[in-house]
Amino acid sequence: MRPILELPRLSMKERDRRYAAVRTQMAARGLDAIVLWGWPMMWDFYTANSRYLSQIGGNAEFNVLIFPAVGEATSIIQLPTFLDGWRAAQDWVTDIRPRAKTWAHSVASRIKELKLERGKIGMDGLAGPLDPDGWLPRDVYQGLLDLLPGANLVALDDMLEKVRAVKSDEELGVLRKAAQLGDLMLATCRDTARVGVKECEVYASMMHAMVGNGGEEPTLFLWNCDRHPYPHPFRVPTVRPMDSRDLIICEMHPKFGGYFTHVERTFCLGEPDKEQLRIYDGCLAAYQCGLDNFGPGKPISTALMAVKDVIDERGLAICEAGIHGHGLASLEYPRFRHHALAADQQAVKVIGDRFETGMVFAFNIDLVDPRWHGGKTGCVFAETIEITATGARRMHTYPTEFQRLAG
């Protein structure tokens, strides 16, 4: 087997930059080590922290990373059958082990090897500002408490998420490739969606466009198709042949090298209702308002409240509208979503109410008209935005206008 697999990888310089940044934060908290529970849930979003320091992840791989303040990182994956593959897929971590007995036993064993069984150990996966439920199973946590009774296990809260909020040049390069995959997916929908073609056939063609050009699974891809679809795309396509004047609304998180972008569009097989065009025009007006108000040093909340003013002035209502950070996960920092305002006002307090150069986020605007069909149908639009030194730049190139297809 080849010693190096043809997969996206970042440089050792990038690894060293990340290791230094994380260890600075660890020192400030007095942490001897951190354990990052890379649990493949919610399209692999919960593997982001461990993958950030290892490049191990994808296709629902478990990656529990033990990262000491001094010494070598250790990645624990689920099965020994994938050890050689992960050693060939990346060069950041050489100590890769399979789970032995239980996850708690596997982690405790490495902590004891490091002679940190009485140390202060930070962990993600516990309840924190971005996830009030956490994702670490109770029995795993209890097992660690039992196996490491002298250790001080503490929650990391959003320590890693803050470090990940501003992207490096290498990360931006990977995200641009992910955005290109999104453009290909939209072009595939444009070229294949026709009356009589099954929804699932178009969906499959769009997925082929992503994976066939180097993209990675799993990723979020939501879809709905109907004369008057739900206000928000659903989870799965149906086997129904599409009909004239059907509206397609889709949300994709195109993924490359573990990095997600976010793009949404509305298509119609034929001529849409004038109300649908009016709603979509509202999406574009809100989008332009955001671009005009995003930029380094500018207040996040002010920009997003201006977006809401545009929506309100047009008599439209929000299904979803706002921004959320993108990188190795979705729903990263920065976040300010009008449909989850209480949580995200707190997020602004945590990370600050200013855009910074290098931030990348989804800007989605999914709207309805409450006076039409009771607000139960609408249009969607979203793109991934990069904050540059001089303003805001869209990462996608696919046309923004309403997509009329052959009916």
Give the label of every model feature segment.
Residues 1-407:
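Active-site neighborhoods and metal-handling regions in enzymes and metal-associated proteins
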